UniProtKB/Swiss-Prot annotation:
<comment type="function">
    <text>Required for maturation of 30S ribosomal subunits.</text>
</comment>
<dbReference type="GO" id="GO:0006412">
    <property type="term" value="P:translation"/>
</dbReference>
<dbReference type="GO" id="GO:0000028">
    <property type="term" value="P:ribosomal small subunit assembly"/>
</dbReference>
<keyword id="KW-0963">Cytoplasm</keyword>
<dbReference type="InterPro" id="IPR035956">
    <property type="entry name" value="RimP_N_sf"/>
</dbReference>
<comment type="similarity">
    <text>Belongs to the RimP family.</text>
</comment>
<dbReference type="InterPro" id="IPR028989">
    <property type="entry name" value="RimP_N"/>
</dbReference>
<dbReference type="InterPro" id="IPR036847">
    <property type="entry name" value="RimP_C_sf"/>
</dbReference>
<dbReference type="InterPro" id="IPR003728">
    <property type="entry name" value="Ribosome_maturation_RimP"/>
</dbReference>
<keyword id="KW-0690">Ribosome biogenesis</keyword>
<dbReference type="Pfam" id="PF02576">
    <property type="entry name" value="RimP_N"/>
</dbReference>
<dbReference type="InterPro" id="IPR028998">
    <property type="entry name" value="RimP_C"/>
</dbReference>
<dbReference type="GO" id="GO:0005829">
    <property type="term" value="C:cytosol"/>
</dbReference>
<protein>
    <recommendedName>
        <fullName>Ribosome maturation factor RimP</fullName>
    </recommendedName>
</protein>
Length: 202
C-alpha cells in the first residue's frame, strides 16, 4: 500500500482529517491533521486539534508504519496552524468567509476587466473567500479584496482619504496552484493559542 494511502486510512480511521504529508531529505515525516469538517457548524463551535490528538495519531502511525516497513527517521504529527493549506472543495466550503492567500497557475490575463487596476500578469492575491456562480458545472469561488496602500507604523490615516474600491476575481479549483488561510493572528477565532505538535524519533 502506498505511504499516502496508509497514512490517510490510519488518520481517518481514528476520526481525524489528513491535511498534508511532507517528507524531507533528512528523513523527517511530517503529518498534519485536523478535525473533520461538519457542514452547518456554528461559528466558534468548531473543535481544534490538541496535543492529545497528536499523540494518539503518532502512536498509531508508528505501529502501522513499522508493519508496512516505511522508511523515516523522525515522525512529526501536528495541527495545521494559522496558514492551513486549502486543497479540496470541502476545504473551500469550510473556510468560506475567511481571509486567504491564493496563487493562480497562470496570470489572470483577460480576466483583468477594462478599467481594472489589477495587472494582467498578477498571480497572487489576498482577500476574503466567497462562493460564486458555478463555472461549467464546477463549484465557483471568488476572492474579494481592496488594494489599500500599506500604512507605516505611526502614520496617521486621513479621514478624508477615499477607500480603495473592492475588487473580485472568480476562479475554480482547477485554476489554483496554491491556496492557504492568510496567517492572521486571531486567538478568538480560527486557532487556539497553542498549536499542537508531537515529534518522535523512530
Amino acid at each position: 500500500m502506498a505511504l499516502q494511502e496508509t497514512i490517510e486510512q490510519t488518520v481517518t480511521g481514528l476520526g481525524y482529517e489528513l491535511v498534508e504529508i511532507e517528507r524531507t531529505s533528512g528523513g523527517l515525516l511530517r503529518v498534519t491533521i485536523d478535525m473533520p469538517y461538519l457542514a452547518g457548524t456554528a461559528p466558534g463551535a468548531e473543535q481544534f486539534i490538541n496535543a492529545e490528538d497528536c499523540e494518539k495519531v503518532t502512536r498509531q502511525l508508528q505501529f502501522v508504519l513499522e508493519v508496512e516497513g516505511a522508511e523515516y527517521s523522525r515522525l512529526e504529527v501536528s495541527s495545521p496552524g494559522i496558514d492551513r493549506p486549502l486543497r479540496s472543495e470541502k476545504d473551500f466550503e469550510r473556510f468560506a468567509g475567511e481571509l486567504i492567500d491564493i496563487t493562480l497557475k497562470a496570470p489572470i490575463g483577460v480576466a483583468a476587466s477594462a478599467g481594472s487596476t489589477v495587472s494582467a500578469s498578477r498571480k497572487k492575491f489576498r482577500g476574503t473567500l466567497e462562493r460564486a456562480e458555478p463555472v461549467d458545472g464546477k463549484p465557483g469561488w471568488q476572492i474579494v479584496w481592496s488594494d489599500e496602500p500599506a500604512v507605516k507604523p505611526g502614520q496617521k490615516i486621513s479621514k478624508k482619504r477615499i477607500p480603495a474600491p473592492l475588487q473580485a476575481l472568480g476562479f475554480t479549483l482547477d485554476e489554483i496552484n496554491q491556496a492557504r488561510l492568510a496567517p492572521v493572528v486571531d486567538f478568538k477565532g480560527r486557532r487556539p493559542k497553542s498549536v499542537a505538535d508531537t515529534s518522535i524519533d523512530k
